[in-house]
Amino acid sequence: MSGLFETLGRRALFTFDAEQAHGLSITGLKTGIVTCRTPEDPALSVKVAGLKFPNPLGMAAGYDKNAEVPDALLKLGFGFAEVGTLTPRPQSGNPRPRIFRLVDDKAVINRLGFNNEGHEAAFKRLSRRAGKSGIVGVNIGANKDAEDRIADYVAGIRRFYQLARYFTVNISSPNTPGLRNLQAREALHELLSRVLEARDEEGNMCTLKRPVFLKIAPDLTDEELDDIAAEADAQKLDGIIVSNTTLSRSGLKNPENSNETGGLSGAPLFERSTVVLARMRERVGPDMPLIGVGGIDSAETALAKIKAGADLVQLYTGLIYRGPGLPGEILRGLSTAIKHEGVSSIAELRDRDTKEWAARKLIS
């Protein structure tokens, strides 16, 4: 399926503007004609933050921004799907064009700016799937013009508490001015304190404790990673997602579109994000869940993330270039890897290569 898509489907979709092509793919999933379900392998099941995932492969936030197709994504074989980023009020994001393909590099640069229809539109859609099986997380953000950005994150926790299986606090998008400043220790302390307080208050009212993950940038210094790890431990955060898109342009094969402002995702992000993942694993120790994101486009890259320290992995850009058959292809490859490695579950392969990845040097 992936090979056929690369030959025919991608050629057709790539005749459209990147944002139009994205809209067409959402429409295709809504029709239900795109399904590539892969038989479940119990050896791929992973328990993370109190949730049992049927497999470790998830759809990253940014694709289904408005919670339109989470169940269709699960039918592609994903073990979980993350919708958003959602802000309290609708916002249009940055002016178009704002998505740029770097085809030779199997990469994308975007400067979307949290364009979404807001909490209420997504709430209505997610309410319609209440009671359905499948893990759907909600990625929450802040409106660009918010006077109190932390209050926007708190609002997201409260609005979606009954519907989200987990939350991701996104403070690492490079496309909202000043947002990444929330990763600094003092600001992060206030953010996590208020968000987790809201989570605990909501949880106490319904006896459900929803995990909260923090999504960080791949462009952080070792000292900044130290601060985030320390704060995550002190606040008893449920996990960290490593990582969002990068501002770095190192290693690109083709300069076309590389000077565009925005975050770079796809294959060139793999090395940087995996190194930062491993370094974060060394800092937080074996118990805190980590979700690896960035450059996953095969079973080999997914397995490398797990061996570098990830409990779960997510992809997005790989799907653009490889098509809807990619999740199944990755899961089959991971099942084969488990047998080849002589272990009984994918979780046993975590951290096999953490030290080697953490020691690699990064080019800015």
UniProtKB/Swiss-Prot annotation:
Record keyword Kinase present: no
Binding locations of substrate: K65, N110, R111, L112, G113, F114, N170, N175, N244, T245
Entry membrane topology: Peripheral membrane protein
Catalytic activity from the UniProt record: (S)-dihydroorotate + a quinone = orotate + a quinol
Recorded superkingdom: Bacteria
Main localization, broad class: membrane
Leader sequence segment: none
Binding site for FMN: A61, G62, Y63, D64, K65, T85, N139, N170, K215, S243, G266, G295, Y316, T317
EC number: 1.3.5.2
Compartments where located: Cell membrane
Active site: S173
Subunit details: Monomer.
Similarity section: Belongs to the dihydroorotate dehydrogenase family. Type 2 subfamily.
Record's function text: Catalyzes the conversion of dihydroorotate to orotate with quinone as electron acceptor.
Protein name: Dihydroorotate dehydrogenase (quinone)
Source species: Brucella canis (strain ATCC 23365 / NCTC 10854 / RM-666)
Taxonomic lineage of the native organism: Bacteria, Pseudomonadati, Pseudomonadota, Alphaproteobacteria, Hyphomicrobiales
Gene behind the chain: pyrD
